[in-house]
Amino acid sequence: MELYFLGTGAGMPARHRNVTSIVLNLLPERGSIWFFDCGEGTQHQILRSPVKLSKSEKLFVTHLHGDHIFGLPGLLSSRSYQGGDTPFTIYGPKGIKAYVDMSLQLSQVHLDYELAIREIPSEGGVVFEDESFRVEAAPLDHRIECFGYRIVEKDLPGKLQQEKLHELGITAGPLYGRLKQGQTVKLEDGRELRGSDFVGPSIKGRTVTILGDTKPCGNSALLAEGADVLVHEATFGAEREDLAAAYDHSTTEQAARTAAEGGVGALIMTHISSRYQGEGAERLLEEARAIHPDSWLAEDFYSHAVPRRQS
């Protein structure tokens, strides 16, 4: 599991930062990648990255401001041109379906794959769940409806303790799979083996929280609680807290406090104003690390592995 940042700027493209798009690489876990937002120019960023559009499965939209969605129609079209034929699902606030449908209709784009669009209720909730992952959404505090997402990897089964089975004279075979699933197995000699006796502790799943644009609010704290990695906007430095409040954004220090108070592992700041370059960007990182030492300032094409934290 790895985060890859295709765009980390705020508002409009800049020379050193494109607008927002984040990829959650789940190729080892489920053979696919998930997008979070798709600002204009995202396809150009993909061409300069290891990201494979053909492996995309889902796209989660935080809100409908242009710097988060203007690249979406083109990305959907290119996915089809590149031979993508597996289903693709978009999740986002009310209005995302009308935006996508109208864009594709007016440009007469035909998709060679099944496209589903799920609009999220204003109160949020669980928007996706299967046997391996759960994704929760909650509304944030921005000028228009905006969501944050909490991606939870479910716990994995513990490792089969093969050495204990070897001691009983049981070699690899179909029984191993049944025991690993926790089943009780009866041997030909009458012995019964309980799977729970031969499987180690479950492996704790990881949690990633990705917030859309927001000023500090209760739901951003709830979504961040205990996350292994928190992706939080930090449009402004601490010296412009007044400007952040006026435009419903956050500062570096506010993002860091959310991470520190929530017991977060790593904080990754993104959605950075173009005014911060060079030494200015370094200062942003210093401000955050003074509060939450495990803080990082994303740049375009920055990647961050999501570790399994020790319980």
Feature roles, as predicted:
Residues 1-49, 85-87, 149-151, 158, ...:
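Conserved beta-strand hairpin/beta-sheet module of binuclear metal-dependent hydrolase folds
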Residues 36-39, 56-64, 93, 209-212, ...:
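Active-site neighborhood of phospho(di)ester-bond hydrolases with catalytic His/Asp-centered motifs
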Residues 109-120, 294:
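A glycine-rich helix N-cap at a beta->alpha junction
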Residues 40-91, 119-121:
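Active-site metal-binding motif and surrounding structural segment of the metallo-beta-lactamase
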Residues 3, 22, 46, 63, ...:
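Divalent metal-coordination and catalytic microenvironments
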Residues 84-88, 262-267, 293:
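A short helix->loop->beta-strand "cap" motif at the edges of active sites that frequently abuts
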Residues 72-78, 277-287:
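Metal-dependent catalytic neighborhoods of phosphoester/phosphodiester hydrolases
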Residues 23, 121-269, 280-286, 306-311:
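Metal-dependent phosphodiesterase/nuclease catalytic metal-binding core
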